[in-house]
Design a protein with these regions (language model features):
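Conserved mid-core segment of classical short-chain dehydrogenase/reductases
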Residues: 22-27, 52-55, 78-95, 136-144, ...
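Catalytic loop of short-chain dehydrogenase/reductase
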Residues: 78-79, 91, 123-171, 182-185
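C-terminal helical subdomain
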Residues: 178, 196-273
Length: 273
């Protein structure tokens, strides 16, 4: 987004390096964006803290940039608990996952809608997961925790909210979509999950490019999608650039992507009617 000239308000609990369990921080992110000529502001915020008013994020971003927010990307995700079967899931774990994966996205999007209406257009993107889809079988995978009931359930919830919100906000010229990686993206967080390796994952640039397409497309045409990154890139014939936007990414251009990797044939859309 920043490489495309969009001012970015980055939100995270980790303001400085070492604040969180994973590498990276808001300060490092802002420094990288500014070094590449972009404009960004850091908003340290814990979306799960009790009593948190998430509307403050939208208000602070609006004040920082001097105009209403017109793009919201909900990328926060709560605990997966893949190792816990649904009869053993605690109420606390369920509540935390719903608060982070569903309510946080709902609150932030809803808080931004008035400003989007004021500006005459807006884009809401919720990052989803292939875990939201139905588990196919029998036969099922040998590992029963692949059911991912809690994490997948919350992502399915946000998918359905997205398509409904797209319908409700269509006349306001506000696009609402979800985007998921075709398989997995080799982020630091993903690499902590068993079986995820850099050599069997997709580069970050593919989902970043697909997200940019959904956050800048015509709200009257590109909305209500339950989209997968590679399928969307092939459908739109969209070049995949490096994160700084200066060059294209070898091996991951639409004409180089193996069709066997696609969950949705490029001649179809993943729209739910």
């Amino acid at each position: 987004l920043a490489a495309d000239g969009i001012a970015v308000a980055a939100v995270s609990r980790s303001l400085r390096a070492g604040d969180g369990a994973l590498a990276g921080s808001l300060e490092e992110t802002i420094a990288q964006i500014e070094a590449d000529g972009g404009r960004a502001v850091a908003l340290p915020f814990d979306l799960t803290a009790p009593g948190t008013d998430r509307r403050d994020i939208i208000a602070q971003a609006t004040e920082a940039f001097g105009h209403p927010v017109d793009i919201v990307v909900n990328n926060a995700a709560g605990p997966r608990h893949f190792d816990v079967l649904f009869p053993d899931m605690t109420w606390e774990a369920f509540h935390e996952a719903v608060q982070t994966n569903v309510w946080a996205a709902w609150d932030l999007a809803a808080a931004a809608v008035p400003g989007m209406r004021e500006r005459g257009a807006g884009w809401i993107l919720n990052i989803s997961s292939s875990q939201a889809g139905p588990r196919l079988g029998p036969p099922y995978a040998e590992n029963p925790t692949n059911g991912a009931v809690l994490y997948g359930g919350t992502k399915a919830f946000i998918d359905r909210i997205t398509t409904g919100a797209a319908m409700e906000l269509y006349e306001d010229n506000i696009a609402v979509n979800t985007l998921a990686p075709e398989y997995q993206v080799a982020t630091d967080n993903a690499l902590t999950v068993a079986g995820v390796r850099k050599d069997n994952s997709e580069p970050e640039e593919t989902i970043a490019e697909a997200a940019l397409a959904l956050c800048t497309g015509d709200p009257k045409k590109l909305t209500g999608r339950i989209a997968y990154n590679l399928s969307l890139l092939v459908e739109l014939e969209r070049p995949v650039r490096t994160l700084d936007g200066r060059s294209t990414l070898p091996g991951w251009q639409p004409n180089e992507i193996d069709s066997a990797r696609l969950r949705v044939p490029y001649t179809q859309t993943s729209r739910i009617l």
